[in-house]
């Protein structure tokens, strides 16, 4: 259950509020790591879980 974790997330961390940094799909996906994805901009719990699996 992710409900208790929602308090730790930024208000902009939901998928509906995401803004793509790269206008062309796939442009930024080649060298994206956890730092680029979750430190330089907010990420959601699902993005974090992808790095733990």
UniProtKB/Swiss-Prot annotation:
| Record carries keyword Metal-binding | no
What PROSITE patterns does this protein map onto?
INSULIN
Q: Where in the cell is it found?
A: Secreted
**Which residues are assigned to the propeptide feature?**
1-30
- Keywords, ordered alphabetically: Carbohydrate metabolism, Disulfide bond, Glucose metabolism, Hormone, Secreted
Cysteines paired by S-S bonds? 38-43
Designated name of the protein = Insulin
Source organism: Anguilla anguilla
């Amino acid at each position: 259950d992710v409900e208790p974790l929602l308090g730790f997330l930024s208000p902009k961390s939901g998928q509906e509020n995401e803004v793509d940094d790269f206008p062309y799909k796939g442009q930024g996906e080649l060298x994206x790591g956890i730092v680029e994805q979750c430190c330089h901009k907010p990420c959601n719990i699902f993005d974090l879980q992808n790095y733990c699996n």
